[in-house]
């Protein structure tokens, strides 16, 4: 992940649900009401890069001056991406899950979410899923480079459509490294 990584940029553009904790003047255009304020408790979906900043930065409220730590501008709401049904599906069989249909940047978003909220359960689920799916990715990448059977290639094409962008990178790297290893063994 880096500043110029296109997958990271696309992941940061993913919209997440949030609720405003304050009336904010002049931001009504986010709701489709230009020139009007966003009212307190208004629910919107905003890009992750914006929500992250608004969820971390707080504002001084005139309502309760005794509060030591200012309340952030927005409260992030749990997205469907990390709903209990999705996490249960991952736990029950990560290899059979079509991760790309859930989100093309699932791992990147999950990593950012787990970091933002220090979500240990999500981190553990991600770790277990990556280990389980990583073995399957490795098996497919090696079998494609070892065998050029048409039926094998069709199975791998279907499998590749279920991978998110991070997993596709792992697949490509594994496939290239396996081919390079075969070349090296032939030369030796």
Curated annotation (Swiss-Prot):
Family matches, as InterPro entries: GINS_A, GINS_bundle-like_dom_sf, GINS_Psf3, GINS_Psf3_sf, PSF3_N
Pfam family, one: PSF3_N
CDD domains the record matches: GINS_A_psf3 (cd11713), GINS_B_Psf3 (cd21693)
Any one GO CC term of the record: GINS complex
Subcellular localization: Nucleus
GO biological process: mitotic DNA replication initiation
Keywords of the record: DNA replication, Nucleus
Family: Belongs to the GINS3/PSF3 family.
Summary of the function given for this chain in its UniProt record: The GINS complex plays an essential role in the initiation of DNA replication.
Subunit structure comment from the entry: Component of the GINS complex which is a heterotetramer of SLD5, PSF1, PSF2 and PSF3.
Protein name, per record: DNA replication complex GINS protein PSF3
Organism phylogeny: Eukaryota, Fungi, Dikarya, Ascomycota, Saccharomycotina
Encoding gene, per UniProt annotation: PSF3
């Amino acid at each position: 992940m880096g500043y110029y990584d296109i997958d990271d940029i696309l992941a940061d553009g993913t919209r997440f649900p949030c609720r405003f904790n304050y009336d904010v003047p002049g931001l009504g255009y986010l709701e489709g009401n230009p020139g009007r304020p966003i009212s307190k408790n208004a629910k919107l979906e905003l890009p992750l890069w914006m929500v992250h900043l608004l969820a971390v930065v707080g504002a001084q409220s005139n309502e309760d001056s005794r509060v030591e730590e200012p309340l952030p501008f927005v409260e992030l709401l749990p997205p469907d991406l990390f709903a209990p049904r999705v996490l249960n599906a991952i736990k029950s069989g990560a290899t059979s899950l079509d991760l790309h249909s859930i989100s093309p940047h699932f791992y990147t978003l999950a990593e950012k979410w787990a970091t933002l909220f220090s979500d240990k359960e999500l981190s553990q689920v991600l770790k277990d899923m990556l280990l389980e799916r990583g073995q399957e990715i490795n098996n497919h990448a090696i079998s494609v480079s070892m065998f050029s059977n048409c039926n094998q290639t069709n199975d791998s094409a279907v499998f590749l459509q279920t991978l998110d962008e991070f997993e596709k990178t792992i697949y490509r790297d594994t496939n290239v490294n396996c081919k390079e290893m075969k070349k090296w063994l032939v030369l030796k």
